[in-house]
Amino acid sequence: GWIRDFGKRIERVGQHTRDATIQTIAVAQQAANVAATLKG
């Protein structure tokens, strides 16, 4: 039914959002490490 399709779509979007969030956090941590290294 359409409800199951809707649920699958939300699931996919949620997974994509989670992946993007994890990537953003990883990039932010890397940037913080670089900044700390530059400061010495």
From Swiss-Prot:
Chief location of this protein within or outside the cell: secreted
Any Gene Ontology biological process: defense response to Gram-positive bacterium
Record-linked InterPro entries: Cecropin, Cecropin_insect
GO cellular component, one term: extracellular space
Intracellular or extracellular location(s): Secreted
Keywords: Antibiotic, Antimicrobial, Immunity, Innate immunity, Secreted
Pfam families: Cecropin
PANTHER family: CECROPIN-A1-RELATED
Family: Belongs to the cecropin family.
Function description: Sarcotoxins, which are potent bactericidal proteins, are produced in response to injury. They are cytotoxic to both Gram-positive and Gram-negative bacteria.
Name assigned to this protein: Sarcotoxin-1D
